[in-house]
Regions:
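C-terminal active-site "lid" helix and adjoining low-complexity regulatory extension at the edge
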Residues: 17, 226, 233, 251-295
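Short, solvent-exposed loop/turn elements at beta->coil junctions and helix N-caps
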Residues: 62-67, 159-163, 250
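Phosphate-binding site of ATP-dependent enzymes
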Residues: 106-213
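Phosphate-binding core of ATP-grasp and ATP-grasp-like enzymes
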Residues: 83, 87-95, 164-207, 231-246, ...
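Membrane-proximal basic amphipathic "stem/tether" segments
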Residues: 1-32, 295
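A long amphipathic alpha-helix within ATP-dependent nucleotide-binding catalytic cores
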Residues: 143-158, 196-256
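A conserved helix-loop-beta module that forms one wall/lid of the active-site cleft
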Residues: 20-125, 129-130, 138-143
């Protein structure tokens, strides 16, 4: 996309009230302090627990990289920053790796890659601490207001298993005032195979879009989760106090578990979250911004 094409797309989205235009409006204008709480990967835990929602367990937390004890971490876990996006490491069999978006860690069917295939992403303990110091000394993108008010922290979390031991999926619930309007199923295998989200309504009816490229294993990856009623209830509890929030859940053997909440999906980039501009406008028009009736 050229710079001119991008500017034209943003203009069209702003004019039509498309979803990304609403995200950009929130980034610029909305200073609701609750946005900070739910976006913070540490604070959102106690906020969710107070509403009866289980989260990914917290193994360790520290505000100082040198106070984060590697020797007490389990051999398999994630270490991430609470105040940013994409700042994460995977520890597997006692070895740290740069995780990124996870695509290097799965094959084209979403199954784990052997350790030999990950050698280029390996990070030793000293490099880990250097990364952690870097993260703790940074603020995430200035345009995303909520991040600027967060206390930098390091978190350790267990690796969550997918119910049924299939490829791990993340269920992104686009929630308006507690009502789920769309569910986008994704995960590392989608990015690896350059596939689009599988999108469903709250009843798990597939929302097909022109130009979409679903994954080859669509039948498996798009299987209706047994915990769908629980997911919708979680979204009601966590989303009812906000005009919009994306609630990201895992479907685990222990049930539906909150991974995180997102108030600025894709950072307001144009042409998101779906491949179809028509559906992006549809989703945007369902989002009623505070003090506004249409846009």
């Amino acid at each position: 996309m050229t710079r001119l094409e991008r500017r034209l797309l943003i203009w069209r989205e702003n004019f039509s009230g498309s979803f990304s235009a609403k995200v950009r409006w929130r980034m610029k204008h909305d200073r609701n302090p609750l946005l900070v709480t739910v976006q913070d990967k540490y604070l959102v835990r106690q906020w969710a627990h107070a509403r009866g929602v289980e989260t990914v367990p917290l193994l360790q937390m520290a505000e100082d990289a040198d106070a984060f004890p590697i020797e007490t971490l389990p051999p398999d876990c994630f270490v991430k920053a609470s105040h940013g996006c994409g700042w994460n490491l995977l520890r597997r069999e006692g070895v740290f790796y740069e995780f990124g978006n996870g695509t290097a860690f799965v094959d084209d069917h979403g199954l784990p890659q052997p350790a030999a295939a990950l050698a280029a992403r390996r990070v030793d303990d000293a490099a880990c601490r250097a990364l952690w110091r870097k993260w703790l000394g940074q603020k995430y993108l200035a345009a995303e207001w909520a991040y600027q008010l967060m206390t930098p922290r390091l978190l350790a979390e267990p690796v969550m298993a997918q119910r049924g031991n299939g490829p791990q999926r993340l269920y992104r619930l686009f929630t308006m005032q507690g009502v789920v309007q769309a569910i986008a199923v994704g995960g590392p295998v989608f990015v690896r195979t350059e596939s689009d989200y599988l999108v469903f309504d709250r009843n798990w009816t597939r929302i097909r879009m022109p130009g979409e490229h679903p994954p080859v294993d669509e039948a498996v990856l798009g299987e209706r989760p047994q915990t769908l009623p629980d997911m919708l209830e979680i979204a009601r509890r966590l989303g009812s106090e906000l005009d919009f929030v994306r609630i990201d859940l895992f479907d685990t053997p222990q049930g539906a578990i909150l991974n995180e909440m997102t108030v600025y999906p894709s950072g307001g980039q144009p042409g998101r979250p779906f491949v179809s501009a028509t559906h992006n406008r549809w989703l945007g028009r369902l989002w009623k911004l505070p003090g506004r009736t249409r846009r």
